[in-house]
Amino acid sequence: MSAYGLQRLYIGGDYVDATSGVTFDTFDPATGELLATVQQASEADIERAVQSAREGQRAWAAMTAMQRSRILRRAVDLLRERNDELAELEMRDTGKPIAETRAVDIVTGADVIEYYAGLATAIEGQQIPLRAESFVYTRREPLGVTAGIGAWNYPIQIACWKSAPALAAGNAMIFKPSEVTPLSASKLAEIYLEAGVPAGVFNVVQGDGRVGAMLSAHPGIAKISFTGGVETGKKVMSMAGGSSLKEVTMELGGKSPLVVFEDADLDRAADIAVTANFFSAGQVCTNGTRVFVHQSVQPAFEARVIERVKRIRVGKPSDPSTNFGPLASAAQLDKVLGFIESGKREGARLVAGGARIVEGDYARGQYVQPTVFSDCRDDMKIVREEIFGPVMSILSFVDEDDVIERANDTIYGLAAGVVTENLARAHRAIHRLEAGICWINTWGESPAEMPVGGYKQSGVGRENGITTLEHYTRIKSVQVELGKYQPVF
């Protein structure tokens, strides 16, 4: 008997059975136990979701912006009231420590909805004078039906991040969570409905990449917001363009550089590096996995990193003292272990971790040791490719120009950071680093006000911040002539 039973689709304000006849199972990453059996959506189910979203969106867009704002604020209140309940569900689904899901996942999702609830009434056009008796005005209008495709590392947070600007602008959204962590998105749908969002405005369809492809190719969907891997993102963009030239926003992978200069506070630098690699067991898109350390301070920096890695508390996710849990799936565990073996084969020096954790009950879960390699080379697989697990690669440098060039030598451009006491150098380096999200003397915070997205193959467009509303509206220009019309013929 599974803990959460049979999971159905959420369409039109209620749970409905999928018509595909296909199901898949989802498991607790910490124990291997069956969590739920999930129904997979069919093409007919997607059609039903689109039609439901169209109907709901008309009612939602007909409300005033202030009405939509109040409803979204009520959803925020409900999320915060149910934080602990949702955090436990997220813990079981992702394997994250309960201390983390209580403090981060729902909290940051609610913050973003609150932020866009406040901006709903600020969506406005312009008035452009042409001459004494003629002017143009513009309107920002909703796109209609949009779709969000989530990743497995932050299920409910991503659902909030994608739906908040969409709904604030008057759109509907059909959301597909990852099949690896499918449980919490439907709870958000329940909360939206309870808060007063019309039925159909936020639908949840379950399934694997085939369902994502149906959404991407559907001509009735005006926009796709996708979070995931680069190769899948390229497929989504191709299908979106090929079907209806729909707009896409994508937050994709990263192999982000963290540069520690010789004047850095090494205790601070080590704290930042360990957080930037081992928070959420390393399953964060923006992780600073390429740690470039000035040659003169590398030994002292390594010693501090090792000291902090020893303090990491691996344990059961339900234990409030645990701050490092399992990876989200068996497939991800195998992938990470493969990268670790690659690092060993290619000659990187292993200074911490390097193996699966198999003692006692840990053998039932997807646990891997926090792993640190040093003396890495730029051509190593662990340095070039996104691992998405708890593996830090330390590389040395001696010259600022050289390290910037090496840091930028990647297909990715999601995040970057520097640690230095010299603020002039900090800004100079950051301005040269090719990344969409940058940190100076810190790492990882992504407040609602901060646009998030990447350069190069790390993404298209932005999430969060005021600019994101532009991705969920379209501009209509209207000319008004007050004077006599001058005929051409």
From Swiss-Prot:
Residues binding K(+) 2: L245, K456, G459
Catalytic-site annotation from UniProt: K162, E251, C285, E463
SUPFAM superfamilies in UniProt: ALDH-like
Highest taxon of source: Bacteria
Binding-site residues for NAD(+), renumbered to this chain: G150, A151, W152, K176, P177, S178, E179, G229, V230, E231, T232, G253, C285, E386
Known EC number: 1.2.1.8
Cofactor: K(+)
CDD domains per the UniProt record, alphabetical: ALDH_F9_TMBADH
Binding-site residues for K(+) 1, renumbered to this chain: T26, D93, V180
The protein's annotated pathway: Amine and polyamine biosynthesis; betaine biosynthesis via choline pathway; betaine from betaine aldehyde: step 1/1
Function: Involved in the biosynthesis of the osmoprotectant glycine betaine. Catalyzes the irreversible oxidation of betaine aldehyde to the corresponding acid.
Protein name as it appears in the record: Betaine aldehyde dehydrogenase
Species whose genome carries this gene: Paraburkholderia phymatum (strain DSM 17167 / CIP 108236 / LMG 21445 / STM815)
